[in-house]
Design a protein with these regions (language model features):
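Cytochrome P450 catalytic-domain helical core, especially the substrate-recognition surface
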Residues: 2-54, 78, 301-308
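Cytochrome P450 proximal C-terminal region
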Residues: 4-6, 139-142, 237-311
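Conserved cytochrome P450 catalytic core segment spanning the I/J/K helices
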Residues: 40-117, 145, 150, 172, ...
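Conserved cytochrome P450 K-helix E-x-x-R motif and the immediately C-terminal K′/meander segment
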Residues: 46, 143-186, 208
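Conserved, non-catalytic sequence blocks in retroelement Pol enzymes and Pol-derived host proteins
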Residues: 60-67, 143-151, 185-188, 250-256, ...
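Cytochrome P450 catalytic-core helices
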Residues: 112-131, 135-137, 256-273
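Loop/turn positions that initiate beta-strands
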Residues: 191-194
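Conserved cytochrome P450 K-helix/beta-meander segment immediately N-terminal to the heme-binding cysteine loop
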Residues: 199-232
Length: 311
């Protein structure tokens, strides 16, 4: 199971946004990457479908099955009903839809957290002052305070998400029967057919009309009195200043888990190690590269030293 999920994640990381532009060779290379992804998807179905079928039989069995008070995720998928395209009423999920949702649940959060962690460490290495301030907070705190009691750690994670949202563009489907569409404060007539709207989340976090010095990594902006004071990982009801996890009823359901993971990982790395530039290196290369996630074009290279006194 772990091997299949790892192969899927590796394939995802190699897929770049498809474009009609580019040379014929670029399109051939991209098609080969997509074919690899499709082949891995077949492997996921072969792996997961027997387990789905076995669980469905267990749920339908008259024999009692005690789950210890916890309900498996797959059981909620059995009960889910979605609109039935081209027909009245609602239907249950198809097997391929369940495979996609289970795969997303098991593995999709890994790549986003890893990408955010690399960006956070890159900026921390590039700015020793941020590392010193963050380590002071982590050393003085307890593990139980990582989630809610370390404001600067929270600010570092938010600043990383503002500058480097894992998915820089979020597409949303608009139905043809929409009453009206609001774009840039202007109402547009409903389209003749369904279409997609792309939200440029990456540009939103770098908007100079909203953020002061938007290209500067400055976690203090999310502390009291900063221009990001009160801004969180999900947008508020009045103004959308950043939305790294989406917004509305389609926001990412894993936002809570992602924030906890990033804080815990970052706190542990600051507590145990010193992070610095490699000897002879001038600065961290913060150039971005578009892949399935927004990643560093040149992977982070750092000199990591275990602290003499581990707190």
């Amino acid at each position: 199971m772990r091997r299949v999920i790892q192969n899927f994640q590796l394939a995802i990381g190699q897929v770049k946004p498809f474009s009609a532009k580019g040379s014929l060779m670029d399109k051939i290379v991209e098609w080969r990457r997509l074919r690899r992804l499709f082949a891995i998807n077949v492997g996921l179905k072969e792996l997961l479908l027997p387990h789905i079928a076995a669980r469905r039989m267990a749920v339908q069995s008259p024999r009692p099955h005690d789950e210890g008070g916890r309900r498996p995720y797959v059981d909620s998928l059995f009960d889910l009903r979605v609109p039935n395209e081209g027909a009245a009423g609602r239907r249950a999920l198809r097997d391929d839809e369940m495979v996609n949702l289970i795969t997303e649940f098991l593995g999709a959060g890994t790549g986003t957290v890893v990408a955010c962690m690399e960006w956070a460490l890159a900026h921390i290495v590039d700015k020793p002052g941020v590392q010193e301030k963050l380590r002071g907070e982590v050393d003085d705190g307890e593990v139980s305070r990582v989630v809610a009691g370390m404001p600067y750690l929270h600010a570092v994670v938010l600043e990383t998400l503002r500058m480097h949202p894992p998915l820089p563009v979020i597409p949303r489907h608009v139905h043809a029967d929409a009453v009206g569409v609001l774009v840039g404060g202007m109402s547009m007539p409903p389209p003749a057919g369904d279409f997609y709207v792309n939200f440029s989340v990456g540009d939103m976090g770098r908007d100079s009309k909203i953020w002061s010095e938007p290209d500067e990594f400055r976690p203090e902006r999310f502390l009291a009195g900063g221009d990001g004071d009160g801004v969180g990982p999900l947008p508020g009801p009045k103004q959308i200043r950043m939305m790294p996890f989406g917004a509305g009823h389609r926001f990412c359901p894993g936002v809570g888990m992602a924030m906890v993971n990033m804080k815990c990982f970052l706190a542990a790395l600051m507590r145990e190690f010193e992070w610095a530039l490699p000897i002879g290196t001038g600065a961290v290369d913060l150039t971005e590269m578009d892949s399935f996630f927004k990643v560093m074009k040149k992977p982070l290279s750092a000199r990591v030293t275990r602290r003499r006194k581990s707190i």
